[in-house]
């Protein structure tokens, strides 16, 4: 928590000139605390993919937390009917619909917004929402670049709103077990993303579907003709809109690895390399790597390693893990993939784990599931206690930045990069610094503001 406070102060004072003192964590610093008896009206922005989970989560707590999904917003109107039907069936209420998020922000009846848009819309949408006084839940990765994450933090501070991020929360009991010395001094954490990623083909450019407001969908990205293979979901695999699997699945495991190492800071050394293997470029136009290894070192020498392997590969660990984490300590190691188990030294059988009495999770511990983050978000809107957010935007920035820093090294041929985390600049490397933001700039009017 101390490092989080320090980062917020530095980010605000260093780049925005906002004198916040310790107010960022005081309930009295938030002017828009929502009373216990007042219904909280939510707009879910982006309902074609991950947004469906947001609809379900808020519907499940509609009575216990007095929440209503008052609006659904998506630039593709083809998703509206199913989203409205879901809300009707799960909550008994019919939400309004909108394709332009700016109109949602102008609606004074909306208290908070929940973003499940593509990555490249997260920062600008969040900043606009903050400027309108809306609290924000934003999916992982919180940003498309390192600079965007910093601007989001500054906006939350300036407009005194809460921002929760949607990286999978690391299981509280596993993290506490390691923090309390369960496997000794942890010196390395690994993250695994071993998802099969086959060719998705090539199609010629075409007119966008009549249901899609394409200019708004493209937003801050450079203008390009509509192409089905660069649209819904496949935007992940093109640099102007996505961050590859290192920035797609990666933030979940990077987040868990960082938390397990006890790091609320940036690494000081980065190198990442890989490529597109096993796919004929004549049959698939993918730009981001399907195979990538990213290495990070922190100031105290602790290491983080992240592997993306989208072609034929083995699973790892005793659980045959394909999506998860491995932690290595001076007295043993721990496997984490939903559940977890710890091994002493060279022993073959675990001595602690998620289903063992040695480490049972407190049922009140909200860190153990993604769904709990939605309820926690609403709780904080009522209490005003920013420090109670289990997935605070600052942590989301550290986790997302790992993916961004890795991709910067990848773009530069995998070369070693030295990073000054306090300044969020590379050391004597203007070529790398240029990649901390959009290399192509921001397309008007969807421009990231210099001052939020």
What are these regions (language model features)?
Residues 215-302, 312-314, 318, 394, ...:
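Rossmann-like dinucleotide-binding domain that binds NAD(P)(H)
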Residues 67-69, 349-362, 381-395:
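Glycine- and charged-residue-rich phosphate/anionic-cofactor binding loop of Rossmann-like
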Residues 190-230, 234, 435-441, 447-448:
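Core domains of carbohydrate- and sulfate-ester-processing enzymes
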Residues 135-137, 142-216:
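A contiguous active-site-proximal alpha/beta segment in oxidoreductase catalytic domains
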Residues 1-135, 147-162, 452:
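N-terminal glycine-/serine-/threonine-rich beta1-alpha1-beta2 phosphate-ribose binding loop
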Residues 10-36, 158, 284-287, 381-452:
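C-terminal helix-rich "cap/oligomerization" subdomain common to oxidoreductases
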Residues 284-372, 421:
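NAD(P)-dinucleotide binding in Rossmann-like oxidoreductases
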Residues 225-234, 370-380:
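Active-site-adjacent bridging/hinge elements
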